[in-house]
Protein backbone atom coordinates (compact mmCIF):
# COMPACT_ATOMS: atom_id res chain seq x y z
CA UNK A 1 0.00 0.00 0.00
CA UNK A 2 1.27 3.48 -0.72
CA UNK A 3 2.86 5.25 2.20
CA UNK A 4 0.72 8.38 2.00
CA UNK A 5 -2.34 6.74 3.59
CA UNK A 6 -2.35 7.40 7.34
CA UNK A 7 -5.70 6.05 8.55
CA UNK A 8 -5.68 3.52 11.38
CA UNK A 9 -8.28 0.83 10.81
CA UNK A 10 -9.66 -1.78 13.16
CA UNK A 11 -10.81 -5.26 12.25
CA UNK A 12 -13.82 -7.07 13.67
CA UNK A 13 -12.96 -8.59 17.03
CA UNK A 14 -14.34 -8.68 20.57
CA UNK A 15 -13.53 -5.03 21.22
CA UNK A 16 -15.88 -2.11 20.67
CA UNK A 17 -13.91 -0.92 17.64
CA UNK A 18 -15.84 -3.02 15.17
CA UNK A 19 -15.41 -1.40 11.80
CA UNK A 20 -15.40 -3.86 8.95
CA UNK A 21 -18.32 -5.88 7.74
CA UNK A 22 -19.62 -7.42 4.56
CA UNK A 23 -23.26 -6.42 4.56
CA UNK A 24 -26.11 -8.33 3.03
CA UNK A 25 -28.19 -6.41 0.56
CA UNK A 26 -27.58 -3.28 -1.47
CA UNK A 27 -26.81 -0.77 1.26
CA UNK A 28 -25.08 2.41 0.17
CA UNK A 29 -23.72 4.86 2.69
CA UNK A 30 -20.81 6.96 3.85
CA UNK A 31 -18.88 5.30 6.69
CA UNK A 32 -15.98 7.68 7.30
CA UNK A 33 -14.44 10.81 5.88
CA UNK A 34 -10.90 12.00 6.55
CA UNK A 35 -9.24 15.29 5.68
CA UNK A 36 -6.05 17.17 6.50
CA UNK A 37 -4.37 20.40 5.42
CA UNK A 38 -7.58 21.97 4.15
CA UNK A 39 -9.07 25.24 5.42
CA UNK A 40 -8.95 24.97 9.25
CA UNK A 41 -7.96 21.29 9.28
CA UNK A 42 -4.27 21.03 10.11
CA UNK A 43 -2.19 17.88 9.93
CA UNK A 44 -2.32 16.18 13.32
CA UNK A 45 1.00 16.03 15.23
CA UNK A 46 1.19 12.26 14.74
CA UNK A 47 0.69 12.68 11.00
CA UNK A 48 -2.96 11.67 10.88
CA UNK A 49 -6.06 13.47 9.67
CA UNK A 50 -9.34 14.80 11.02
CA UNK A 51 -12.05 12.16 10.89
CA UNK A 52 -15.83 12.18 10.64
CA UNK A 53 -17.18 8.72 11.44
CA UNK A 54 -20.62 7.11 11.33
CA UNK A 55 -19.37 4.13 13.35
CA UNK A 56 -21.41 3.80 16.54
CA UNK A 57 -19.81 3.54 19.97
CA UNK A 58 -21.39 2.00 23.06
CA UNK A 59 -25.13 2.44 22.68
CA UNK A 60 -27.40 2.01 25.69
CA UNK A 61 -30.58 3.65 24.41
CA UNK A 62 -32.14 4.90 21.19
CA UNK A 63 -31.12 1.67 19.51
CA UNK A 64 -33.59 2.39 16.74
CA UNK A 65 -31.07 5.00 15.58
CA UNK A 66 -28.45 2.30 15.01
CA UNK A 67 -28.06 -0.07 12.10
CA UNK A 68 -26.39 -3.36 12.97
CA UNK A 69 -26.12 -6.77 11.42
CA UNK A 70 -24.29 -8.57 14.21
CA UNK A 71 -20.86 -7.46 13.04
CA UNK A 72 -20.99 -3.69 12.80
CA UNK A 73 -22.94 -0.83 14.33
CA UNK A 74 -23.50 2.30 12.29
CA UNK A 75 -25.36 5.50 13.03
CA UNK A 76 -28.31 6.12 10.74
CA UNK A 77 -27.68 9.85 11.13
CA UNK A 78 -25.28 12.10 13.01
CA UNK A 79 -24.99 15.73 14.11
CA UNK A 80 -21.84 17.83 14.25
CA UNK A 81 -21.82 20.47 16.96
CA UNK A 82 -19.32 22.82 18.56
CA UNK A 83 -18.41 26.41 19.28
CA UNK A 84 -18.39 29.14 16.66
CA UNK A 85 -15.39 28.88 14.32
CA UNK A 86 -14.74 25.32 15.50
CA UNK A 87 -14.71 23.96 11.94
CA UNK A 88 -18.24 22.58 11.55
CA UNK A 89 -18.96 24.29 8.25
CA UNK A 90 -15.44 23.55 7.02
CA UNK A 91 -16.11 19.83 7.43
CA UNK A 92 -19.04 20.12 5.04
CA UNK A 93 -16.94 22.27 2.70
CA UNK A 94 -14.19 19.63 2.74
CA UNK A 95 -16.64 16.89 1.74
CA UNK A 96 -18.10 19.10 -0.96
CA UNK A 97 -14.61 20.01 -2.21
CA UNK A 98 -13.61 16.36 -2.51
CA UNK A 99 -16.83 15.55 -4.36
CA UNK A 100 -16.35 18.41 -6.82
CA UNK A 101 -12.72 17.50 -7.47
CA UNK A 102 -13.67 13.91 -8.26
CA UNK A 103 -16.52 14.89 -10.57
CA UNK A 104 -15.10 17.97 -12.29
CA UNK A 105 -11.44 18.43 -11.38
CA UNK A 106 -9.83 21.11 -9.23
CA UNK A 107 -12.17 24.13 -8.90
CA UNK A 108 -11.32 27.81 -9.16
CA UNK A 109 -9.65 29.16 -6.03
CA UNK A 110 -8.30 25.81 -4.87
CA UNK A 111 -4.71 27.03 -4.60
CA UNK A 112 -5.58 29.05 -1.47
CA UNK A 113 -7.51 26.36 0.41
CA UNK A 114 -4.64 24.70 2.26
CA UNK A 115 -4.55 25.21 6.05
CA UNK A 116 -2.78 28.52 6.66
CA UNK A 117 -2.10 28.13 10.37
CA UNK A 118 1.40 27.00 9.39
CA UNK A 119 3.23 28.62 6.43
CA UNK A 120 4.88 25.27 5.66
CA UNK A 121 1.48 23.83 4.72
CA UNK A 122 1.59 25.67 1.40
CA UNK A 123 3.96 23.04 0.02
CA UNK A 124 2.48 20.07 1.88
CA UNK A 125 -0.15 17.72 0.44
CA UNK A 126 -3.79 17.90 1.44
CA UNK A 127 -5.40 14.55 2.19
CA UNK A 128 -8.94 13.41 1.36
CA UNK A 129 -10.43 9.95 1.82
CA UNK A 130 -13.92 8.48 1.96
CA UNK A 131 -14.90 5.04 3.15
CA UNK A 132 -18.18 3.82 1.72
CA UNK A 133 -20.40 0.78 1.86
CA UNK A 134 -21.45 -0.10 -1.66
CA UNK A 135 -23.44 -3.17 -2.70
CA UNK A 136 -22.37 -5.17 0.34
CA UNK A 137 -18.68 -4.32 0.14
CA UNK A 138 -16.55 -1.73 1.89
CA UNK A 139 -14.24 0.57 -0.07
CA UNK A 140 -11.83 3.41 0.61
CA UNK A 141 -11.15 5.97 -2.10
CA UNK A 142 -8.89 8.95 -1.70
CA UNK A 143 -6.20 11.20 -3.06
CA UNK A 144 -3.50 13.64 -1.98
CA UNK A 145 -2.98 16.96 -3.70
CA UNK A 146 -0.64 19.91 -3.20
CA UNK A 147 -3.26 22.60 -3.61
CA UNK A 148 -0.91 25.55 -4.03
CA UNK A 149 0.72 23.78 -6.98
CA UNK A 150 -2.44 22.17 -8.43
CA UNK A 151 -0.67 18.80 -8.35
CA UNK A 152 -2.11 15.43 -7.34
CA UNK A 153 0.60 13.25 -5.85
CA UNK A 154 -1.31 10.04 -5.09
CA UNK A 155 -4.66 8.34 -5.63
CA UNK A 156 -6.06 4.99 -4.46
CA UNK A 157 -9.09 2.71 -4.39
CA UNK A 158 -8.99 -0.30 -2.10
CA UNK A 159 -11.49 -2.87 -0.92
CA UNK A 160 -11.50 -3.37 2.86
CA UNK A 161 -11.99 -6.77 4.46
CA UNK A 162 -13.17 -8.02 7.84
CA UNK A 163 -9.76 -9.56 8.64
CA UNK A 164 -8.14 -6.10 8.55
CA UNK A 165 -6.61 -6.67 5.13
CA UNK A 166 -6.93 -4.40 2.12
CA UNK A 167 -7.23 -5.52 -1.48
CA UNK A 168 -5.71 -2.97 -3.81
CA UNK A 169 -7.89 -2.18 -6.80
CA UNK A 170 -5.62 0.60 -7.95
CA UNK A 171 -3.01 2.94 -6.52
CA UNK A 172 -1.11 5.77 -8.16
CA UNK A 173 2.17 7.20 -6.91
CA UNK A 174 2.33 10.13 -9.28
CA UNK A 175 5.54 11.57 -7.85
CA UNK A 176 7.40 8.38 -8.78
CA UNK A 177 5.40 7.82 -11.99
CA UNK A 178 4.10 4.43 -10.90
CA UNK A 179 0.76 2.71 -10.51
CA UNK A 180 -0.59 -0.69 -9.49
CA UNK A 181 -3.74 -2.57 -10.48
CA UNK A 182 -5.13 -5.38 -8.37
CA UNK A 183 -8.18 -7.44 -7.48
CA UNK A 184 -10.84 -7.65 -10.18
CA UNK A 185 -9.17 -4.80 -12.07
CA UNK A 186 -6.20 -7.11 -12.74
CA UNK A 187 -8.41 -9.56 -14.63
CA UNK A 188 -6.86 -10.78 -17.87
CA UNK A 189 -7.99 -8.64 -20.76
CA UNK A 190 -9.25 -5.87 -18.52
CA UNK A 191 -5.82 -5.17 -17.05
CA UNK A 192 -4.37 -4.62 -20.50
CA UNK A 193 -7.09 -2.06 -21.23
CA UNK A 194 -6.60 -0.28 -17.91
CA UNK A 195 -2.82 -0.27 -18.36
CA UNK A 196 -3.35 1.97 -21.38
CA UNK A 197 -5.50 4.48 -19.48
CA UNK A 198 -3.35 4.42 -16.34
CA UNK A 199 -0.18 4.64 -18.38
CA UNK A 200 -1.42 7.74 -20.16
CA UNK A 201 -1.66 9.60 -16.83
CA UNK A 202 1.17 7.79 -15.07
CA UNK A 203 3.00 11.03 -14.28
CA UNK A 204 0.13 13.46 -14.86
CA UNK A 205 -0.50 15.33 -11.63
CA UNK A 206 -3.49 17.20 -13.03
CA UNK A 207 -5.80 14.22 -13.47
CA UNK A 208 -7.59 11.65 -11.31
CA UNK A 209 -7.85 8.17 -12.77
CA UNK A 210 -11.34 7.68 -11.32
CA UNK A 211 -12.61 10.66 -13.29
CA UNK A 212 -10.87 9.57 -16.48
CA UNK A 213 -12.40 6.10 -16.18
CA UNK A 214 -15.85 7.67 -16.18
CA UNK A 215 -15.46 9.65 -19.37
CA UNK A 216 -16.64 7.90 -22.54
CA UNK A 217 -15.91 4.38 -21.30
CA UNK A 218 -19.30 2.79 -22.03
CA UNK A 219 -17.84 0.03 -24.20
CA UNK A 220 -15.31 -0.94 -21.53
CA UNK A 221 -18.03 -1.44 -18.93
CA UNK A 222 -20.17 -3.37 -21.38
CA UNK A 223 -17.32 -5.78 -22.11
CA UNK A 224 -15.87 -6.14 -18.60
CA UNK A 225 -18.22 -6.59 -15.66
CA UNK A 226 -15.29 -6.40 -13.22
CA UNK A 227 -14.50 -2.85 -14.32
CA UNK A 228 -17.85 -1.57 -13.06
CA UNK A 229 -16.49 -0.93 -9.57
CA UNK A 230 -14.89 2.22 -11.05
CA UNK A 231 -18.23 3.26 -12.47
CA UNK A 232 -20.15 2.39 -9.29
CA UNK A 233 -17.87 4.28 -6.90
CA UNK A 234 -17.95 7.34 -9.15
CA UNK A 235 -21.72 7.01 -9.48
CA UNK A 236 -22.16 6.84 -5.70
CA UNK A 237 -20.19 10.06 -5.27
CA UNK A 238 -22.13 11.76 -8.05
CA UNK A 239 -25.65 10.55 -7.24
CA UNK A 240 -25.76 9.51 -3.58
CA UNK A 241 -23.41 11.93 -1.83
CA UNK A 242 -25.84 14.84 -1.43
CA UNK A 243 -24.25 17.85 0.27
CA UNK A 244 -26.45 20.77 1.31
CA UNK A 245 -25.62 24.09 2.96
CA UNK A 246 -27.90 25.96 5.42
CA UNK A 247 -29.02 28.47 2.80
CA UNK A 248 -29.63 25.77 0.20
CA UNK A 249 -33.15 24.32 -0.15
CA UNK A 250 -33.54 20.58 0.04
CA UNK A 251 -35.13 19.41 -3.17
CA UNK A 252 -36.58 16.09 -1.98
CA UNK A 253 -39.72 16.55 0.11
CA UNK A 254 -40.84 12.93 -0.13
CA UNK A 255 -40.79 12.69 3.68
CA UNK A 256 -43.78 15.04 3.77
CA UNK A 257 -45.79 13.00 1.27
CA UNK A 258 -46.91 10.71 4.09
CA UNK A 259 -49.68 12.09 6.29
CA UNK A 260 -48.29 10.58 9.49
CA UNK A 261 -44.90 12.15 8.82
CA UNK A 262 -46.46 15.53 8.15
CA UNK A 263 -48.34 15.30 11.44
CA UNK A 264 -45.08 14.42 13.16
CA UNK A 265 -43.39 17.52 11.74
CA UNK A 266 -46.31 19.65 12.90
CA UNK A 267 -46.12 18.22 16.42
CA UNK A 268 -42.39 18.90 16.60
CA UNK A 269 -42.83 22.51 15.47
CA UNK A 270 -45.69 23.01 17.95
CA UNK A 271 -43.56 21.64 20.78
CA UNK A 272 -41.18 24.55 20.27
CA UNK A 273 -44.04 27.01 20.63
CA UNK A 274 -43.79 28.01 17.00
CA UNK A 275 -47.10 28.52 15.26
CA UNK A 276 -47.46 27.12 11.76
CA UNK A 277 -50.23 29.59 11.06
CA UNK A 278 -52.62 26.77 10.29
CA UNK A 279 -53.55 23.72 12.32
CA UNK A 280 -53.02 20.55 10.38
CA UNK A 281 -54.57 17.22 11.14
CA UNK A 282 -55.38 14.68 8.47
At which residue positions do the language-model features occur?
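Short, positively charged and aromatic/hydrophobic N-terminal segments
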Residues: 1-27
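Pre-Walker A-like glycine/lysine-rich segment at the N-terminus of P-loop NTPase domains
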Residues: 20-97
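Residues in well-ordered beta-strands of folded domains
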Residues: 34, 53-55, 131, 144, ...
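Short acidic, glycine-rich loop/turn motifs
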Residues: 35, 40, 130-136, 159-161
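Short acidic/polar mixed-charge low-complexity motifs
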Residues: 48, 135-139, 166
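Conserved P-loop NTP-binding catalytic core
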Residues: 66-79, 83, 92-150
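A broad, structural surface signal
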Residues: 89, 93-96, 100, 263-270
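Electropositive, glycine-dotted interaction segments
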Residues: 140-281
Amino acid sequence: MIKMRKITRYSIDKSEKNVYSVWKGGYIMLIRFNVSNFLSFENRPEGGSEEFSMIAGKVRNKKEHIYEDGKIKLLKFAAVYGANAAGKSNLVKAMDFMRRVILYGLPDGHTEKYCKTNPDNEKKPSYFEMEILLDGKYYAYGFEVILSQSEFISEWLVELHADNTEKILFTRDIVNSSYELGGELAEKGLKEKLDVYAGDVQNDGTALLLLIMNQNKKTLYENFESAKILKNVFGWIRDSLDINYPNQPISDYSYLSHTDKLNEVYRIISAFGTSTGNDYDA
